[in-house]
């Protein structure tokens, strides 16, 4: 399962820019990767982990702006079509999971 966080935060004043930067840094600290400047994603071990991450994000919400959280399956993630300029990028693949024993 994949978790995608999309947000649109105000960055007009220096304080708003600082708040938005802090929110982005918090996502990176939680293991999210930046897809676009306001779109971050991460692989979850299962649906059970989703609620914990949503709780953490809720605790870090800035006072203004909009934040959306999406949860998608591995298959839906692999079906994402991405372009860089006019060039289609390769389909995304789920990273292999390490087995520890």
Stretches found by the model and what they are:
Residues 2-4, 10-101:
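Basic nucleic-acid-binding interfaces
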């Amino acid at each position: 399962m994949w978790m995608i966080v999309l947000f649109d935060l105000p960055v007009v004043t220096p304080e708003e820019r600082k708040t938005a930067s802090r929110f982005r840094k918090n996502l990176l600290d939680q293991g999210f990767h930046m897809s676009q400047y306001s779109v971050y994603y991460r692989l979850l071990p299962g649906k059970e982990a989703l609620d914990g991450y949503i709780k953490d994000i809720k605790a870090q919400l800035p006072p203004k702006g909009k934040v959306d959280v999406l949860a998608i399956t591995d298959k839906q993630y692999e079906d994402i079509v991405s372009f860089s300029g006019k060039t289609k990028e390769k389909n995304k693949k789920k990273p292999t999971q390490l087995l520890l024993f």
